[in-house]
């Protein structure tokens, strides 16, 4: 399934499975098998804890999505005296073919927090729709993206539907008009 996806024009693949089904082992195999097919393979996770666990298991560099796609653009002091950092989307890496593998994708949302929630934050990221921001950053003609996760896990904070956006073929088709493939272990 993965080989067929890599050789196709489709840009998005969902690798789904419950805990203990071999997703992490498969990530390591994907990296080994397709390292020469791309200029670079970037491995990301939705949280710092998830990236640390994955890094330790497969001995490969892993960053959070936020660290990989955002750059600090402004630091300000609010009326309350609280510092606030604002981040903008990094520039798209052109002329490079990159395979992005994102672990713990069930935690990636696409719903922005309310104005009240944003006012309380010390960090602000672009328009706060992480999935949309990631796709804006990573989708190009040369790149491929594999979202890995457990569809039975809780979905991201602020997601009001039962659907986990970053693991849903239907969501990508309806919201982003992107065709995708999927496989469940």
Question: What does each of the following model-derived ranges do?
Answer:
Residues 1-185:
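Conserved ATP-binding/catalytic motifs of P-loop helicase motor domains
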